[in-house]
A protein has these predicted regions:
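Aromatic-lined carbohydrate-binding/catalytic grooves of carbohydrate-active enzymes
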Residues: 71-107
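Active-site neighborhood of glycoside hydrolase catalytic domains
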Residues: 172-180, 186-195, 199-273, 277-303, ...
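Aromatic- and acidic-residue-enriched segments that line the glycan-binding/catalytic groove
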Residues: 85-100, 135-160, 197-220, 265-277
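Substrate-binding cleft of secreted/luminal carbohydrate-active enzymes
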Residues: 284-310, 326-404
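Pro/Thr/Ser/Gly-rich low-complexity, intrinsically disordered linker/stalk tracts
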Residues: 383-384, 388-439, 494-506
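Beta-strand-rich modules
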Residues: 473-497
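Active-site-adjacent "subsite" loops/lids of carbohydrate-active enzymes
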Residues: 34, 42, 46-58, 129, ...
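Catalytic domains of carbohydrate-active enzymes, especially glycoside hydrolases
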Residues: 58-85, 187-190, 289, 295
Length: 506
């Protein structure tokens, strides 16, 4: 019986890999040199509650190791789910999603955000601190710490369907959230600040947002209540991005909105052929305004539906976002479990992963993918992780450029040389000097080409590693085969320097 099960497992995996290769070839999938490959690691579902410090660190380290093997190069780590903190904060209380009790510090003490920054950077990954801006209490939180903003300033929150929401119509709430963001940006070496889809609450039939008083007092001359709500969120997004870049220009500010901007209907031309909740009309989030005005540095619409969904077809939506949200880098939020669950419409023996990745490759303004959620990829649901590491994300990828922040390439590496050491044959180089943050070298890219092969740095299959180290161990065999190694520098915005070549016999 066990033997038969193992044979079935092997056959199923082989079939999936065959489907991946078939679809990739048939739909024109090619590896990308620059691609954002992210994953969300959330706390809000309680996956860490009850874990000791050691157990949580082991769990996170294992997830990061597996995601690194899958080719992931960025992590969105949730550090603020309900005006709380998974980091040391003098502004907000420790999260119950960390210790089980809001306001209780972890024992033995540690700072999860600082630890994750170190662990991600060690693995060559970016770390984006993920915050929920307005939610002050989730449905299942029954007790708030006295330090919590809803306890200290109850008039600044409103209840809605079991939630507490920081009222977006109050300037002091906007300033408060930005104060929290500034504190993180100042004290931590993060690569980005990330905010998800929760702005005004998702609408519930029969419930009204209780903001009559705030609208009457602070309408700013806006006669339409919906426009006023959008104005409140717009001002927050604009001011938050400006505050981040004043402190650290290289810290990226991004959002992951709900997957539908607006449903197309008479009077709404810039809408998709969908029938669902809308950012603009229901959540009061004018995402296209933020993108087109440059108030955010990247956008990750959450396209969690399948191809062929009757109300929110994935193909329709990814093509819509590709068309309308190209003013800033566009990454697509993917639901791993749903993608693995649904069969491809044209090839029912395969799930929808190959078809979706083919769309990513074909659409010119799609610059990356973010996986919802990390653990699903780590658990290899539907062999999703296997397909990433063996096919789609097999080769390392640089981050997409952000020339609106910095477009100047750094200086190339210096003193590239190969040396025999007690640890083997090592390729060494040194970091060039820098006078300013946008000149500073942050990482290096190492390429390898065989003898006679054209040096083409646009070919990602030639990337050996992307590293912050100033050396690379060479795979010496017998010294009979000739290669050309190429080393380049990267700055914080992934601008790439000129190349330095070194011919070697391995």
């Amino acid at each position: 019986m066990t033997k038969n099960l193992n044979l079935r497992k092997v056959f199923f995996l082989a079939l999936l890999m065959f489907c991946a290769n078939l679809f990739a070839a048939g739909n024109g999938y090619t590896p990308q040199k620059r691609e954002f490959r992210g994953a969300w690691i959330q706390c809000v579902n309680g996956q860490f509650i009850g874990m000791s410090t050691q157990k949580m660190q082991q769990t996170l380290a294992y997830q990061l190791d597996e995601l690194q093997k899958d080719g992931v190069n960025a992590i969105f780590f949730q550090v603020r789910a309900e005006c709380d903190a998974l980091y040391k904060s003098d502004i907000e209380p420790w999260s119950r999603f960390l210790t089980g009790v809001q306001g209780k510090a972890p024992q033995p003490y540690w700072d999860p955000l600082q630890w994750m920054i170190e662990q991600c950077h060690k693995r060559g990954m970016e770390l984006h601190a993920w915050l929920n801006p307005y939610r002050a209490k989730t449905k299942f939180t029954s007790t708030l710490d006295p330090k919590h903003v809803a306890m200290k300033h109850p008039s600044r929150v409103f209840p809605y369907d079991g939630l507490f929401i920081l009222n977006p119509g109050l300037r002091e709430n906007r300033e408060y959230i930005i104060k929290v963001v500034d504190d993180i940006v100042e004290r931590y070496d993060i690569d980005g600040i990330h905010m998800d889809d929760y702005f005004y609450p998702y609408p519930v039939a029969g419930l009204q947002i209780p903001d009559d008083r705030e609208y009457a007092a602070n309408s700013n001359g806006i006669s339409n209540r919906d426009d006023w709500r959008r104005y409140n969120v717009n001002v927050f997004i604009k001011e938050c991005g400006e505050a981040i870049h004043r402190l650290k220009p290289w810290v990226k500010f991004g959002v992951s909105p709900f997957g539908i901007y607006r449903n197309k209907r008479p009077g709404v031309e810039v809408g998709s052929l969908t029938k669902g909740t809308q950012n603009y009309d229901d959540l009061y989030a004018d995402v296209l305004l933020w993108v087109n005005n440059g108030w955010v540095d990247y956008c990750v619409p959450q396209l969690y539906w399948q191809i062929g969904h009757s109300a929110a077809d994935y193909k329709t939506l990814i093509e819509w976002w590709n068309r309308y949200a190209s003013a800033r880098p566009l990454y697509i939020g993917e639901d791993v479990e749903r993608t693995a669950k649904f069969a491809d419409l044209d090839n029912p023996n395969c799930n929808q992963m190959p078809a979706k990745f083919a769309l990513h490759s074909q659409l010119p303004n799609v610059n990356g993918t973010v996986l919802w959620y990390a653990k699903a990829a780590v658990d290899n649901v539907g062999n999703y992780g296997t397909m990433l590491r063996n096919k789609y994300w097999r080769y390392p990828a640089l981050q997409p450029r952000m020339p609106f922040i910095d477009s100047k390439a750094p200086k190339k590496p210096k003193k590239v040389k190969s040396v025999w050491t007690c640890d083997g044959y090592i390729l060494f180089w040194t970091k060039p000097n820098a006078k300013h943050w946008d000149d500073e070298v942050y990482k290096f890219v190492v390429y390898r080409f065989e003898k006679g092969e054209k040096i083409n740095l646009d070919d990602p299959t030639k990337i050996v590693t992307i590293t912050d180290k100033e050396y690379h161990k060479l795979p010496y065999v017998d010294g009979k085969k000739r290669y050309t190694y190429v080393v380049t520098s990267l700055d914080r915005m992934s601008n790439e320097s000129k190349a330095v070549k070194k011919k070697l016999k391995l």
